[in-house]
Amino acid sequence: MADEKTEDRRPATLVGAAAATFATNAGTVTFSLLNVLILARALGPTGRGEVAFVIAVWVLTAGLATLGFEEANGNLGGRHPERRASLATNSVVAALALGILGALIVGLLMTLVPRTRGEVDLGLLLFALATLPSGLLGQNLKYLLQSDYRFGVTNLAWFASPAVTAVSNGVLALSGALTVERVVLIFVATNVLATLILVVSVARHFGFGRPDAALARESLSFGLKTHLSKFMALGAYRGDQWLLGAIVGPYELGLYSIAASLAEALFYVSGVIVLVQRPHLVRAVSAQAAEFAARIFRRAVVLSTAVGAALFVAAPTLCVLLFGKSFRGSGDDLRLLALGALGVLALDLFSGVIVAQRRPLLASAGTAVALLVTVIGNIILVPVLGGGGTAVAKSAAFTAGGATMVLIFLRMFDAPPGALIPRLDDVAWYGRKLREGLLAARRAG
């Protein structure tokens, strides 16, 4: 039975939500990297590249097919709790219709233009694409639950997929039975599992109401405004792997994908911040949003800089130590990707701020710049430099896109540039939180 109460569940502070989400993120990253390690050791660069290509195609197609319904759920669900049940049912309808349509379009493209699928088996790609409705539904329901600050269950779903994936692939690898086809099957199955977790939670807390055509039109109207920006951002993040695999094949993609997986530690810093600040920013007036976002950005710069510097120094040794000598070339790619750390942060965080303040079209500027640099850079550099060319293009794209969003944020909120420069207090903030955490742990013990 669905909960009858729809009052605002806003917590007194976002620190707890951020800490829980970041802890889940740390576990997710750990299992994701463990899975990358298993695949690299068991399948080698070429097999790893084939898997990366299938996942890149699936993720990009899902991003294209959403039409922004998940973003609309985040905003409409946050402002109108009484409409969540209808939003849930509309999410199911949209996921089915758009997922099937997206799979048909991309499947037809790859059938008619074989070069777009590189050297990967068409049947394997079509199998993965057939599960798009489940993936879209999971995205829609995740944002709906987060609009009610239900980060616990979305964190569970987020964590379950890579955890089960890593364990399953590990068992198969130890038995010598791991293949590219089985890896893709497990990827699909664990995504369905994550979606089922969210479906159960939505049914319990909101229920599934009657479909609402007027509400669907409102969701589509808002969603389309955010869709271009979000898909371009996804293209900047994942489009390089599709391009690299199609242009030079799975071996180079296998090397690059290892570096990209390790570099995702940079992306998760900004990704977690955007998730936990979204419900607050949706409800905040302009001045509050500007002050809040600037403070969060300064503190995140401190963390992103530290993570980026550590990756740059450790990259060559780290790739060989974890994945073996056959992945030696991944170290140079990782160093190049680490240079884009602050660009990633600025692009993600300020795009999220502007979308939450109901200016989704404006948020597309930075992602448009990033995607343009990504595509042009890959076309020019990949035939000459392989995966290294993709890494250069990606860092340049994030830096250019992030700089664009900084300028837009400062102008939109009339904020001084100095508001974004980290201060000693921002560094000290981490020390204070660490001491508070240790003290709380000591008291609990």
Show which residues each predicted segment covers.
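Interfacial segments at transmembrane-helix termini and the short loops linking adjacent helices
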Residues: R10, P45-R48, M110-A128, V313-L342, ...
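Interhelical loop/hinge segments that connect adjacent transmembrane helices in multipass membrane
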Residues: M1-L14, G152, G176-I186, L196-Y237, ...
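Transmembrane helical elements of multi-pass membrane transporters/channels
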Residues: G16-S32, T154, W158-T165, V183-V202, ...
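Membrane-interface junctions at transmembrane-helix termini in multi-pass inner-membrane proteins
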Residues: N75-R79, S134-L156, R283, L339-G366
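Membrane-water interface segments that mark the loop-to-transmembrane alpha-helix transition
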Residues: V15-T28, S32, V54, G63-M110, ...
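Hydrophobic alpha-helical transmembrane segments
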Residues: D121-F127, N155-R204, V369, V373, ...
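Signature of the first transmembrane helix
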Residues: D3, R10-E70, T131, L224-Y251, ...
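Helix-loop junctions and terminal segments of transmembrane helices
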Residues: A65-E82, A263-A287, S351-A356
